[in-house]
Amino acid sequence: MSDSSSLDYEPGVLRVLQTKSETKAFYDKIAKVYDLLAEHSERPMREAGLRLLATAPGEHILEIGFGTGHILAELAEAVGPTGKVFGIDISENMSAHARDLLSNKGLIDRASLDCGDAESLPYGDDSMDGIFMCFTLELFDTPDIPKVLAECKRVLWPDGRIVVVAVSKEGKGGLVIHAFEWTHRHFPNLMDCRPIYARRALE
């Protein structure tokens, strides 16, 4: 998602060509079929990330970019009746699907959902025990990523934790990374996420 006029882009990382309004419209449009497109392929990495987060009963956990709500539901189960999960997503239609999912599972009372921008989180300082992002950080243009992470730092407890599942250029990406970049370069409206240096951004 790009609304920034800055030219300070990281070498080797592709630009985000869509504006935030275009990104919102895209996810509003595909909300009904998103699970068919991504749920199966994203699940293994999502579950690995959730194990790292190690959510405990009674905690306050934030998910940024919650989509159709499957992760929120798992987090709501993990925090139990004494905890709370919070979610922010740019898409109103995704938010509606997530609310329906949580309601159907009897978990809506443990959740608070917002439709908005992660560059300006509507939560108080030191209010979260943990933050989870799954294939969300790479949707932001390079100059905007530090803004998102600064907001994460603000709302986290000093000893809080953040887990980011991302398409990362670090490690052994090989053909998968090249495939993501080729698709993003030629079909940015279909492949809106692109590989980033996720670990470096979090340091």
Question: Where on the chain are the PLM-derived regions?
Answer:
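A short glycine-rich, Lys/Arg-flanked "PGG" loop and its adjoining helix->strand segment in the class I
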Residues: 146-158
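Conserved alpha-helix/loop element of class I SAM-dependent methyltransferases that forms part
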Residues: 40-57
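Class I SAM-dependent methyltransferase SAM/SAH-binding core
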Residues: 62-120
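Helix-to-beta-strand junctions that scaffold the AdoMet/dcAdoMet cofactor pocket
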Residues: 80, 140-141, 156-157
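Conserved beta-strand signature within the Rossmann-like core of class I S-adenosyl-L-methionine
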Residues: 159-166
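N-terminal, positively charged/glycine-rich alpha-helical extensions of SAM-dependent methyltransferases
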Residues: 1-31
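A short acidic, Gly/Pro-enriched loop at the edge of an enzyme's catalytic core
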Residues: 119-131
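Short alpha-helix
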Residues: 190-203
